[in-house]
């Protein structure tokens, strides 16, 4: 009798199985398509396919004035819109050589930290949902709603605020709003404790996240990781402390780091970062209630005049008209400005040719560097761990595809 195994041609032998994960998968966090090669249930290879949300943002910015370019940045990482505007404004201000007044800096820092809470709340709670916990997102979204109302009261919009402008912020915050943000902080810390009690020591959650997607510090740096991905692996690298911008150097906060660089450590770092952000917000609120002053530079060639001035002064009217039609001219040169966005180092490389529009605006999205390591992080893990690793990377496709 002939042995069937001998008769089988090489092509008929057992092949690895290929499946598509996404782009409509609920755990894909947007329009990610992963082509997975599986050996049984073990992941052999991960191939991310991106570009499904590509809108040509960098090219569109080249045809807009510096002021018109600001709203494009809200639409990159749409979980924390103002943090992106911040990097662009810092880059433009470096080229213009202008200083933002202290009150403007405090408002920017306050809203950047609100953005960090918005982003981390979304990530931590949906990450818990990806591995099977259904309660956290319901709690998290309730808090995000309160924070979005603070966005709305400052700028008129819940998400795409366009509130940070080159030179400062669009307008001052009403005292009642600052007081309400202060009143939000302590109950929010109580909610974080509840969330901690529900998820952090949960046996099933730990089984799904401990020793999954481990990345050593050397690997993290070699892949170009930043933000939580580096801090989770044990490096206390935070641009707010390492290269302070605005008034971060005057504020008191700690930088949490992980030990093992796995999904669980990254989750714990994000939880602690929310506490530190709340600490920063309290300090900003305290100073905003004490100190008055302008919220943007007084140079009317860059920042539009107040409405009252326009009714009295012809010159103010001319400034307003010129700013909103032609825009301001930025001296020729190139500059790189980066902020510690919730996802990592968000950088803008801005090249000016001396006109009213950017010659080139290169956006450095942190999620792009993190997503490229999916193959490295998932290889050898089970299929179910892919969504855990992806959730711990905290990826948003607005910024990855741009």
Curated annotation (Swiss-Prot):
It is a peripheral membrane protein. PANTHER family: NADH DEHYDROGENASE [UBIQUINONE] IRON-SULFUR PROTEIN 2, MITOCHONDRIAL, NADH-UBIQUINONE OXIDOREDUCTASE 49 KDA SUBUNIT. PROSITE patterns: COMPLEX1_49K. It is found in: Cell inner membrane. It comes from Xanthobacter autotrophicus (strain ATCC BAA-1158 / Py2). This is NADH-quinone oxidoreductase subunit D. The keyword DNA damage does not apply. GO terms for cellular component: plasma membrane. Its EC number is 7.1.1.-. It catalyses: a quinone + NADH + 5 H(+)(in) = a quinol + NAD(+) + 4 H(+)(out). Its main location: membrane. NCBIfam families: NuoD, PRK06075.1. Belongs to the complex I 49 kDa subunit family. InterPro entries: NADH_Q_OxRdtase_suD, NADH_UbQ_OxRdtase_49kDa_CS, NDH1_su_D/H, NiFe-Hase_large. Keywords: Cell inner membrane, Cell membrane, Membrane, NAD, Quinone, Translocase, Transport, Ubiquinone. GO terms for molecular function: NAD binding; NADH:ubiquinone reductase (non-electrogenic) activity; quinone binding. NDH-1 is composed of 14 different subunits. Subunits NuoB, C, D, E, F, and G constitute the peripheral sector of the complex. It comes from the Bacteria. Pfam families: Complex1_49kDa (PF00346).
């Amino acid at each position: 009798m002939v042995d069937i195994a001998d008769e089988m041609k090489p092509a008929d032998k057992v092949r690895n199985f290929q499946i598509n994960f996404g782009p409509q998968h609920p755990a894909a966090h947007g329009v990610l398509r992963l082509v997975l090669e599986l050996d049984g249930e073990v992941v052999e290879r991960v191939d991310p396919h991106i570009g499904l949300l590509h809108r040509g943002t960098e090219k569109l910015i080249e045809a807009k004035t510096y002021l018109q370019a600001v709203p494009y940045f809200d639409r990159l990482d749409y979980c924390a819109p103002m943090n992106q505007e911040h990097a662009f404004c810092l880059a433009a201000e470096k080229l213009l050589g202008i200083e933002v007044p202290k009150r403007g800096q405090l408002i920017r820092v306050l809203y950047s930290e609100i953005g960090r809470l918005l982003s981390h709340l979304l990530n931590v709670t949906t990450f818990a949902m990806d591995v099977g916990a259904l309660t956290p997102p319901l709690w998290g979204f309730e808090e995000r709603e309160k924070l979005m109302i603070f966005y709305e009261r400052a700028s008129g919009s819940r998400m795409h605020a366009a509130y940070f402008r080159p030179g400062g912020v669009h307008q001052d915050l009403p005292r009642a709003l600052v007081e309400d943000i202060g009143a939000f902080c302590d109950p929010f810390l109580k909610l974080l404790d509840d969330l901690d009690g529900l998820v952090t020591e949960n046996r099933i959650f730990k089984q799904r996240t401990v020793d999954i997607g481990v990345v050593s510090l050397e690997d993290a740096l070699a892949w170009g990781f930043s933000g939580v991905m580096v801090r989770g692996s044990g490096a206390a690298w935070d641009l707010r402390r390492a290269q302070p911008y605005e008034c971060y150097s005057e504020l008191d906060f700690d930088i949490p780091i992980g030990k093992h660089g796995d999904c669980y450590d990254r989750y714990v770092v994000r939880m602690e970062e929310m506490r530190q952000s709340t600490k920063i917000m309290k300090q900003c609120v305290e100073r905003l209630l004490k100190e008055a002053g302008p919220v943007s530079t007084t140079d009317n060639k860059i920042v539009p005049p107040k409405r009252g001035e326009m009714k009295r002064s012809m010159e103010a009217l001319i400034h307003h008209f010129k700013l909103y039609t032609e825009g301001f001219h930025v001296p020729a040169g190139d500059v790189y400005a980066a902020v510690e966005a919730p996802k990592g180092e968000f950088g803008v490389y801005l090249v000016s040719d001396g006109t009213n529009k950017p010659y080139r605006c290169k956006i450095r999205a942190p999620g792009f560097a993190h997503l490229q390591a999916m193959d490295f992080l998932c290889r050898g893990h089970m299929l179910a761990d892919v969504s855990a690793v992806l959730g711990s990377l905290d990826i948003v496709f607005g910024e990855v595809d741009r």
